[in-house]
């Protein structure tokens, strides 16, 4: 966490509140927020919006071998959704492990993404009843980030467009718990030559690696600004210089494939983006 924040600050970016590279803030660690997540899960249970699911990971993987729907994968078919209280108690007595899933309503969720425009989707289209807490007690991403956003009063969420299918799920949790729903902006991804999303296997393109190799942070920002349509050419630039030129509507919707020219610009001429 500290190294990540240090890399972000090296890029010339800063933030208004929260931990810093010099000072941690335990309230921002999800591992310290389990009591809050537990209370919110209990609230969903009391509203009959959460139910125990006894399906194993193997069961879910088998279900996922069915034809996928969109980017969210195969929907969970609700195998345990309508178990009677007696059936639930019997399975618990038998020692079967269970997770907790959100009971998805049939109604569509609508929101306007600041980049991709109006969106409408049912939770079934986004994977069906989703996990809130795993059988080992770990809270799911969907519950944790929704509660964090609501509890901290987050008004704008900016992230990669691969998380667009998660948005209706998070809106459902936020609304069920009485939280305000933030604005969402999903941005296109950087891809390698094989059109795969940049990931851990591209370690040489991590901020830490680029920084260690002596790449100028202003060149990184300049490349990203050009890709995002904020500037009309690659040129070194400080983030502060881009603030007045930034417009959500100028952002492209298509992912960007990094090229050899981009590597040359960053001073990484001998690297293949694959």
Locate the predicted segments by residue.
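Non-catalytic terminal extensions that flank enzyme cores
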Residues: 11, 90, 107, 196-201, ...
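Short, structured secondary-structure boundary patches
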Residues: 3-11, 34-39, 70-80, 203-207, ...
